[in-house]
Amino acid sequence: MKRIILTRGIPASGKSTWAKQEVLKDPEHSIRINRDDLRNMSGQYWVPAREDYIKACKGTMLMNAINFKFDTIIIDEMNLNPKETGYLKEVVSIMNDTFKDNNDKYIIEIKDFTKVPLDVCLERDSKRENPIGENVIRGIFNKYKELYNLKETSDE
């Protein structure tokens, strides 16, 4: 079976670094989808009025990747919101129903980065060319810390 891998973790936990390296292992059969990259390609990074467009682009890329039968599709995002991951699972299930050959069907896997502590993520973010910022990362951490048992420091 083919795989759709959802990275899961707060910003700067290593998701994109891992995903970019992973697709290089088999570039002919692997693809990475990332909304941040779509935003950067569209001009100014954060334009709230453009988010529906970005979401539609991501959906189109996913459908095309499935139709082109890539072996591995990595959705390189936080994937922390259960509602969003549930939607992705539903879309994949519907697409799988259209394939007669089981070898064309996809399974969903989670590549988990939720064990990377907040302090490590904040340090990594501070070294980025375009940091997200401590307040934003802490906000995301606080929103999901109970759901995923997120840790603030390496000592916990």
Where are the model-predicted features located?
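Conserved beta-strand segments of the P-loop GTPase G domain that flank and frequently precede/overlap
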Residues: 74-76, 111-114
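Conserved substrate/cofactor phosphate-moiety recognition/catalytic segment
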Residues: 17-72, 122
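Conserved nucleotide-binding/hydrolysis micro-motifs of P-loop NTPases
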Residues: 37-39, 79-80, 114-120
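Conserved GTP-binding G-domain of TRAFAC-class P-loop NTPases and closely related GTPase folds
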Residues: 1-8, 13, 21, 27, ...
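Glycine-rich phosphate-binding loop used to anchor ATP phosphates in small-molecule kinases
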Residues: 49-106
